[in-house]
Amino acid sequence: MQKRLLSELYKEAGVDPCTVPYVELHGTGTLGDTPEANCVTEVFCGNRRSTPLLIGSTKSNMGHPEAAAGLCALCKVLIAMRDHAIPPNLHYSEPNPHIPGLLDGRLKVIIHICLTFD
């Protein structure tokens, strides 16, 4: 269902998901991370993508803000766009073996400040 929703939203907006440089994930370190990341890999990392999709989560920077999680993620992305820099994810050390996109390099967790959104 997530995959269909994302695909339809980007199609309706006229945006090719393969051109999106960064996606903010929920990333709570729970079982839900695997299906979320695998769905994002399928939608955003098609055969036409030439660079890894950069991913991150506000939770590594500030903990889980519970009901405000979506708003905090949106604020992080807006500030990153304004400052042309995505903050790194803390405490990431190795890829989840159940997320092929991390293992094969289609997804890349930002672990150093990343300059983008130019």
Tell what function each PLM region has.
Residues 1-118:
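Condensing-enzyme catalytic core of the thiolase-fold
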